[in-house]
């Protein structure tokens, strides 16, 4: 039974998230329907990251096990055909060893959060970025972000319904940069807690507006208390960029 690794991009706007749910369409559900159309039977699609409702992906990775062997280009093209009109694209398919697990074999996940720091309404970036009209102090945001880099207890920055056994994570990167009106927050780690990235972004925006100092960020992290967190950034600016193996 060959195992295929899929590289996937999607617009998360119309979906209730990656994971299959009863209350609305999911990316996983759409992919499983497409795989079933190819294979003639239900096949579970295992993803590397369980993105929330409205979150996008440029490089989500999944794996599937098929009873029949297909050429990798056949798998890619068939899935793309059956996925229409969903805003999901299968960029590539490759055969991998049975020991490969899209979620558990991953060694690092990379995300970017996009902010459009302008007064004008969003047109082309509608549902693709968080528009913030008030000018952000990106230098202060980047300095505050470095407080969070390293191994910490991120209880403050995780959802109260997060099911991870431990709140400790090692954050490898958290950089804030600006190019014109575009503010980018780039982060990477082996894994993240539920809502961790958006919670960090929302708190960094408070720093960018002068509502928080760098000391406030340090105190929030040390509090290990969800109520000490700043606002949670909306999902539309977040993208899963790449998963490393």
From Swiss-Prot:
Signal peptide positions (record): none
EC number annotated for this UniProt entry: 5.4.99.12
Keyword tRNA processing belongs to the record: yes
Location of the active site: 52 (nucleophile)
GO biological process, one term: tRNA pseudouridine synthesis
Chain sites annotated for binding substrate: 111
Taxonomic superkingdom: Bacteria
InterPro entries: PsdUridine_synth_cat_dom_sf (IPR020103), PsdUridine_synth_TruA (IPR001406), PsdUridine_synth_TruA_a/b_dom (IPR020097), PsdUridine_synth_TruA_C (IPR020095), TruA/RsuA/RluB/E/F_N (IPR020094)
Pfam families in alphabetical order: PseudoU_synth_1 (PF01416)
Record-level Gene Ontology MF annotations: RNA binding; tRNA pseudouridine(38-40) synthase activity
This protein's UniProt keywords: Isomerase, tRNA processing
Catalyzed reactions per annotation: uridine(38/39/40) in tRNA = pseudouridine(38/39/40) in tRNA
Function of the protein: Formation of pseudouridine at positions 38, 39 and 40 in the anticodon stem and loop of transfer RNAs.
Family according to the record: Belongs to the tRNA pseudouridine synthase TruA family.
Subunit note: Homodimer.
PANTHER family with a match to the protein in the record: PSEUDOURIDYLATE SYNTHASE, TRNA PSEUDOURIDINE SYNTHASE-LIKE 1
HAMAP family named in the record: TruA (MF_00171)
Name of the protein described by the UniProt record: tRNA pseudouridine synthase A
Provenance organism: Afipia carboxidovorans (strain ATCC 49405 / DSM 1227 / KCTC 32145 / OM5) (Oligotropha carboxidovorans)
Lineage of producing organism: Bacteria, Pseudomonadati, Pseudomonadota, Alphaproteobacteria, Hyphomicrobiales
């Amino acid at each position: 039974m060959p195992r295929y690794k899929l590289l996937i991009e999607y617009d998360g706007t119309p979906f209730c998230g990656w994971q299959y749910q009863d209350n609305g369409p999911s990316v996983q559900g759409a992919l499983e329907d497409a795989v079933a159309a190819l294979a003639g039977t239900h096949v579970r699609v295992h993803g590397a990251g369980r993105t929330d409702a409205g979150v996008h992906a440029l490089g989500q990775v999944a794996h599937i096990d098929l009873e029949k062997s297909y050429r990798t280009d056949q798998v890619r093209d068939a899935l793309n055909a059956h996925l229409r009109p969903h805003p999901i694209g299968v960029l590539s398919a490759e055969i991998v060893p049975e020991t490969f697990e899209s979620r558990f074999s991953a060694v690092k996940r990379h995300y970017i959060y996009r902010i459009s720091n302008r007064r004008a309404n969003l047109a082309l970036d509608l549902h693709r970025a968080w528009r913030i009209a008030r000018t952000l102090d990106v230098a202060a945001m980047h300095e505050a972000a470095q407080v969070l880099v390293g191994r910490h207890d991120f209880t403050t920055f995780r959802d109260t319904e997060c099911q991870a056994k431990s709140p400790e994570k090692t954050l490898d990167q958290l950089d804030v940069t600006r190019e014109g009106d575009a503010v980018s927050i780039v982060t990477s780690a082996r894994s993240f807690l539920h809502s961790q990235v958006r919670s960090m972004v929302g708190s960094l925006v408070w720093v960018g507006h002068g509502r928080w100092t760098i000391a406030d960020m340090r105190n929030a992290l040390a509090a290990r208390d969800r109520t000490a967190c700043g606002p949670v950034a909306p999902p539309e600016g977040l993208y899963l960029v790449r998963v490393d193996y």
